[in-house]
Amino acid sequence: MGLFNFVKDAGEKLWDAVTGQHDKDDQAKKVQEHLNKTGIPDADKVNIQIADGKATVTGDGLSQEAKEKILVAVGNISGIASVDDQVKTATPATASQFYTVKSGDTLSAISKQVYGNANLYNKIFEANKPMLKSPDKIYPGQVLRIPEE
């Protein structure tokens, strides 16, 4: 549990983050619909509240992997600057690291930096499915889960 920071202007565009033309309940509903469409397991077991660019995610009984994927999926929405993790996992597990993609990054380069081996990029790709559809489709500002080697 804790507060995770994201790049507010990067990510999936679900509403007009610049003019804020949606109320908080509408934003939370759009985020929940987005989560349900991703196919992340147990996405329907969380509750989301949005206030001033901060998403608070609550829930109980999720796996560590599902929890992290949900937090990353919520944080990688344009207009979300931080995610307050209030989700309780079913069993304690080691948390993954998070990595913010920079301009020019590739999964291979990130893998080399994190694991010391560029060929382990698929481990990062698999850890970020279904949010990532292809290992080549990452963008600056996107936050990725980096599982243990």
From Swiss-Prot:
One GO cellular component, as annotated: cytoplasm
Subcellular location: Cytoplasm
Disruption phenotype: Deletion mutant shows retarded growth at high concentrations of K(+). Deletion of the gene impacts the abundance of muropeptide species. The absence of YgaU leads to the activation of the Cpx pathway.
Domain LysM: 97-146
GO annotation terms (biological process): response to potassium ion
Any matching Pfam family: LysM
Domain of life of the source: Bacteria
Keyword Cytoplasm carried by entry: yes
UniProt remark on domains: BON and LysM domains are both required for full K(+) binding. The major K(+) binding site is located in the BON domain and this initial complex is stabilized by interaction with the LysM domain.
Protein name: Potassium binding protein Kbp
Organism of provenance: Escherichia coli (strain K12)
